[in-house]
Swiss-Prot record:
Expressed in leaves and roots. Detected in the stele, the endodermis and part of the cortex. The keyword tRNA-binding does not apply. Interacts with SCR1. Interacts with SMOS1. Transcription factor required for the asymmetric cell division involved in radial pattern formation in roots. Essential for both cell division and cell specification. This is Protein SHORT-ROOT 1. One of its GO terms (biological process) is negative regulation of mitotic cell cycle. A motif (VHIID) lies at residues 311-315. Residues 12-69, 101-145, 165-185 are annotated as: Disordered. Residues 365-401 are annotated as: Leucine repeat II (LRII). Residues 411-517 are annotated as: PFYRE.
Length: 602
């Protein structure tokens, strides 16, 4: 059984006999485990500790931590938590799954389900100091002074108020809206959604006894190598635990460092190309945006004199330039006299704490290959990569010299899954960033964003603050919508990729990092706060832009693209019942809109 954490007793040796008796009782009740996997490797990370006080007085109380009042709990007992372990059926991890979540370590231990729990004394430095205190996981059923470090079998019994359905597989089309999912639970067969939402409610209510019970259940059922429900349980459970222990930013840095260590140009290229080959998730926005950019440039060329046109694209995206070869091919079909000079400035954004060495290596290789491809196509071309750390709103657009001293004939701004890199807050930073794009006076701005309402409050409200995103109500709203969105994403990967695939694993781990960011990091630090098309459309209109409808030729290109993929994908026009009416098109999976593409002009 894959597990996110293993709970290990930290009792004194004198209590060993009592622990073994309780462990035997626990094992007799734990007959529903799906079994242990035959291949695993150990991992390294800082061990976290659950505080357990036998005198705490109930599940609703509690001391410090992210939700528990900010007071340090009294030192009595701690459970240490083993870091995330990589397992992959019977395949060697170095053969099938290349990248790891953590590097190997000989200090971690793997305890199989049903084995006797090894007792250890915590080191002198085990009590957290200088960091946010960890939440107590107290149980009212534990007698004062009993002092055991294992869950009681009675405490871990199946909650009688939960009616879970394991009979049918998850379907992303049946999840309902974010609000209904967050309040009413999942549909038939969506056991992960039901358990995770109930666990999130318990976290928000500070019911530590029920949190402990539900986390144990999720831990037994979760696996990053199982079906969609097991993967959702695994990644969201990791995020919930990081939130409870106030270790979200640290966990995210560790995951990002592991990804950076195992990232190369070849692995990035394979993942991007395989994703485009099997799913239209990214290529949908590329085709729509390229069509709008090309048509706007050709309009400028037709109205200008015979002198050589110089076009410049400011590329604010995270797609590693996979969008641009088709645009270069389209420009190459023109006669030699009409072929314009094209410059692309790509801004590569990353969180302040994220490692960037691997991304810089990849972008250098991409730049060289882009320039070589442009020479083969006969298109005069210049490529520049700008690495930016932190909030995208802090990027100095004027310093990029996009007009090249006045030589640029037309400027286009391409925003693909990048606007969410501007952290929403009381200063209306996203509104201000849209206004800064308007000051560039571009010929066209293309916006491609994933369709999810992951901001904690109305981003346009004057009372919206960074702190407002960390209330219990805001957490539940974002958690429910995030569960809906990532459930649909995982479902599309499940039905598009083969069961064993390095590229699929890399994409799922990227989603896992996004889930940890969303669930465990403060709203003021999260880089995953997506918004809906209606919100982006209101913002673009307020900044002085007007929507540009995609031409019939571009729409035909998008439909032709979708016919290359399996059934379930479709294109939908923007509805007429909201402010996004007439602005862009949606990519839908099983009738659920997931990606929005649009074009705008000043």
């Amino acid at each position: 059984m894959d597990t996110l954490f293993r709970l290990v007793s930290l009792q004194a040796a004198s209590e060993q006999q009592q622990q073994q008796q309780q462990s035997a009782s626990y094992n007799s009740r734990s007959t529903t485990s799906s079994g242990s996997r035959s291949s695993s490797h150990q991992t390294n990370a800082s061990y976290s500790y659950y505080h357990h006080s036998s005198n705490s007085g109930g599940g609703g109380g509690g001391g410090g931590g992210y939700y528990y009042g900010g007071q340090q709990p009294p030192p009595s007992q701690y459970y240490y938590l083993e870091p995330y372990q990589e397992e992959c059926g019977n395949a060697p991890h170095h053969q099938l799954y290349m990248d790891e979540d953590f590097s190997s370590s000989s200090s971690s231990r793997h305890f199989h389900h049903g084995a006797r729990v090894q007792q250890q004394q915590p080191p002198a430095s085990s009590t957290p100091t200088g960091t946010a205190p960890t939440p107590p996981l107290s149980t009212s059923s534990t007698a004062a002074g009993a002092g055991h470090g294992l869950f009681e079998a009675a405490d871990l019994s199946f909650p009688p108020d939960l009616n879970l359905d394991f009979s049918s597989p998850a379907s992303s089309s049946g999840g309902g809206t974010a609000s209904s999912g967050a309040v009413g639970g999942g549909g038939g067969g969506r056991w992960a959604s039901q358990l995770l939402l109930e666990c999130a409610r318990s976290v928000a209510a500070r019911d530590s006894q029920r949190v402990q019970q539900l986390m144990w259940m999720l831990n037994e059922l979760a696996s990053p190598y199982g079906d969609v429900e097991q993967k959702l349980a695994s990644y969201f459970l990791q995020g919930l635990f990081a939130r409870l222990t106030a270790s979200g930013p640290r966990t995210l840095r560790t995951l990002a460092a592991a990804s950076d260590r195992n990232t190369s140009f070849d692995s990035t290229r394979r993942t991007a190309l395989r994703f485009q080959e099997l799913s239209p998730w990214s290529s949908f926005g590329h085709v729509a945006a390229n069509g709008a950019i090309l048509e706007s440039f050709l309009e400028v060329a037709a109205a200008a004199s015979s002198e050589t046109q110089r076009f410049h694209i400011l590329d604010l995206s995270n797609t590693f330039c996979t969008q641009w070869p088709t645009l270069l091919e389209a420009l190459a079909t023109r006669s030699a006299d009409e072929t314009p000079h094209l410059s692309i400035t790509t801004v590569v954004s990353a969180a302040p704490s994220a490692p960037t060495a691997a991304v810089q290596r990849v972008m250098r290789e991409i730049g060289q290959r882009m320039e070589k491809f442009a020479r083969l196509m006969g298109v005069p071309f210049r490529f520049r990569a700008v690495h930016h750390s932190g909030d995208l709103a802090e990027l100095d657009l004027d310093a990029l010299d996009l007009r090249e001293g006045g030589a640029t004939t037309a400027l286009a701004v391409n925003c693909v899954n990048s606007l969410r890199g501007v952290v929403p807050g009381r200063a209306r930073r996203r509104d201000a960033f849209a206004a800064s794009l308007r000051r560039l006076d571009p010929r066209v701005v293309t916006v491609v964003e994933e369709e999810a309402d992951l901001v904690a409050s109305d981003p346009d409200a004057s009372s919206a603050t960074e702190e407002g995103g960390d209330t219990e109500a805001a957490f539940l709203k974002v958690f429910g919508e995030g569960l809906r969105f990532f459930s649909a994403y995982m479902d599309s990967l499940e039905e598009s990729f083969p069961k064993t695939s390095n590229e699929r694993l890399a994409l799922e781990r990227g989603a896992g990092r996004a889930i940890v960011d969303l669930v465990s990091c403060p709203a003021s630090e999260s880089m995953e706060r997506r918004e809906t098309a209606a919100s982006w459309a209101r913002r673009m209109r307020s900044a002085g832009f007007s929507p540009v409808a995609f031409s019939e030729d571009v729409a035909d290109d998008v439909r032709s693209l979708l016919r290359r993929y399996r059934e379930g994908w479709s294109m939908r026009e923007a509805g007429t019942d909201d402010s996004a009416a007439g602005a862009g098109v949606f990519l839908a999976w099983k009738e659920q809109p997931l990606v929005w593409a649009s074009a705008w002009r000043p």
